[in-house]
């Protein structure tokens, strides 16, 4: 596996370095489009990479809608010319005015906010009415069982009714993220997803009947969106205009954590970290220049898959170092100072945010360097 991540010219790259593989990114994009039955059905999240080049690559494949976690990400996507952007994070404090200013700055892009709090949505509506916008489109954030954000299913219909009376906002649909759908077995994951979908569909029918503009449904994450791929609303007059979109994020770059946890997903990690041995502090021991300032420190457990070294085990990791010990009997095969290796991050999303730019490789050669555009919390607005 490690041979596919090696490339010419790596000796000149400062380590640790995050490397993206353009051919693998394209392959993952194509697989996601196939699963969604076409690019027009995808509304992908950009938080895993935060890179404008990948937005433009996605648009080359026909993807026109994107989901963001920060206003900086939304600005990056809008700057690429995306047609529809949902800021999938509750707006509180100064972020309400920031969202309004961003929407004003990009009039050709259709922005959506999400919300699960009537007071917050009222504040958003007031801000919209005081601006040149006059109105903001809103998706109700639905608690699909994760209990992180969102309106519980039992309160969804009444909440939407209340939203409809708020001046300055227009109810446009539902944001249905189920990040807790992490069952290892696809059939278990599918069964759990289907169970919630069966609860959601009649609620959506009622909401669409009462509020015809509420026609968008953005559903699923990377592990679950294949389970929702048959979430088709053709069983009634009320939902005939409903549009369903699937919202993976990690699948485009992918990582070791997902590849280990979800063997049914067909994606290949398209990012790796170039690292080097910096010390042999004892027989059979080696330290890499890859601490938790260079690879995400979550989740608990192994923080990445070290390629090209067998029969070794992790000792500990600190800010700038990652130390391993060879297993008994393999001490003589211990990597030497200066040797290069590649690590597939367990969690690519926070790892990407640790680097100002990524080296881009295709067909074993360096072809570009991409800025991690939305790494910071603020760009302009």
Question: Can you annotate each of these PLM segments?
Answer:
Residues 2-5, 24-54:
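N-terminal glycine-rich anion-binding loops that anchor highly charged ligand groups
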Residues 281-381:
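C-terminal accessory subdomain/extension
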Residues 25, 47, 77, 140, ...:
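Conserved, mostly hydrophobic/aromatic
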Residues 45-186:
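Active-site-proximal beta-alpha core segment in soluble small-molecule metabolic enzymes
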Residues 2-20:
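Generic N-terminal amphipathic, Lys/Arg-enriched alpha-helix
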Residues 225-308:
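Active-site loop ensemble at the mouth of alpha/beta enzyme cores that anchors a bound cofactor
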Residues 127-134, 143-258, 262:
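Active-site loop/helix belt of alpha/beta enzymes
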């Amino acid at each position: 596996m490690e041979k596919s991540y090696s490339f010419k010219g790596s000796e000149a790259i400062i380590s640790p370095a995050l490397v993206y593989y353009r051919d693998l990114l394209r392959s993952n994009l194509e697989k996601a489009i196939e699963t969604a039955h076409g690019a027009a059905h995808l509304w992908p999240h950009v938080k895993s990479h935060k890179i404008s080049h990948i937005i433009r690559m996605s648009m080359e494949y026909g993807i026109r809608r994107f989901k963001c976690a920060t206003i900086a990400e939304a600005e990056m996507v809008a700057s690429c010319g995306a047609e529809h952007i949902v800021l999938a994070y509750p707006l509180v404090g100064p972020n309400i005015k920031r969202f309004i200013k961003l929407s004003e700055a990009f009039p050709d892009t259709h922005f959506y906010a999400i919300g699960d709090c009537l007071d917050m949505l009222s504040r958003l509506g007031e801000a919209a009415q005081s601006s040149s916008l006059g109105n903001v489109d809103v998706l109700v954030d639905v608690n699909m069982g994760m209990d992180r954000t969102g309106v519980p299913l039992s309160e969804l219909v009444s909440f939407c009714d209340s939203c409809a009376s708020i001046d300055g906002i227009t109810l446009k649909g539902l944001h249905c993220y189920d990040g807790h759908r992490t069952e290892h077995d696809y059939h278990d994951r599918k069964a759990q997803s289907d169970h919630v979908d069966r609860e959601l569909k009649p609620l959506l029918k009622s909401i669409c009947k009462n509020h015809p503009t509420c026609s968008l449904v953005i559903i699923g994450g990377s592990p679950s969106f294949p389970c929702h791929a048959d979430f088709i609303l053709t069983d009634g007059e009320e939902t005939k205009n409903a549009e369903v979109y699937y919202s993976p994020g990690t699948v485009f770059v992918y990582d070791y954590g997902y590849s280990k946890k979800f063997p049914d997903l067909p994606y290949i990690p398209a990012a790796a970290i170039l690292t080097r041995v910096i010390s042999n502090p004892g027989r059979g021991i080696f330290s890499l220049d890859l601490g938790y300032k260079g690879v995400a420190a979550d989740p608990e457990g192994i923080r990445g898959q070290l390629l090209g070294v067998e029969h070794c085990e992790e000792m500990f990791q600190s800010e700038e170092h990652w130390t391993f010990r060879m297993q008994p009997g393999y001490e003589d095969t211990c990597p030497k100072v200066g040797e290069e290796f590649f690590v597939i991050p367990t969690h690519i999303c926070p790892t990407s945010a640790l680097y100002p730019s990524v080296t881009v490789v295709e067909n074993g050669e360096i072809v570009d360097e991409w800025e991690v555009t939305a790494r910071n919390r603020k760009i302009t607005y």
